[in-house]
Amino acid sequence: FRSIASMPNTLDGEFDLNDELSVEARTILAAAANRGTIDIRANQDSFNSAERFLAVCVESELEQRLLFLQKENPEQTVKFLEGFRQLCQHGLVIHHLQRDFSLSALGFQFARTLDTKDYESSLKFASEIDH
């Protein structure tokens, strides 16, 4: 709880999060703005090594999940994972249990300032998954 207590709780600050966060981090926020649910996934049984990478999965709508992983583009997959790390670093995400995360109150607040249309091309990297 010490780490939660030390998190920023307002967007008023000395720096601009738009400058601090990568486009991948902001894309994750834009995708998560409605539900705020994020988890980290891996497919350890895949033959392809890039499919075994850790990947960010966002519940963008109820029962709609976006997985930011493409075996054909491992570099971009890693950029989205790095974007998630940035969200954690800035207190925009809270860790719950195991692989489960959510936006923090500050994360929801900042996500709602973003225009999803600005991230349409980045969102195309993600694939919709069933579970």
What residue spans do the PLM features occupy?
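Long, low-complexity, charged/polar intrinsically disordered regions in eukaryotic proteins
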Residues: 1-42
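Non-catalytic, well-ordered alpha-helical scaffold segments
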Residues: 22-26, 81, 85, 105
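Generic structural signal for hydrophobic core residues of well-folded globular domains
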Residues: 32-36, 91, 111-114
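A composition-biased, non-transmembrane "mature-region" signal
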Residues: 40-49, 120-121
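Short helix-coil junctions and helix-kink-helix linkers
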Residues: 47-77
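Short amphipathic alpha-helical interaction segments
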Residues: 70-90, 95-97
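Minor-groove-contacting beta-hairpin "wing" of winged helix-turn-helix DNA-binding domains
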Residues: 100-104
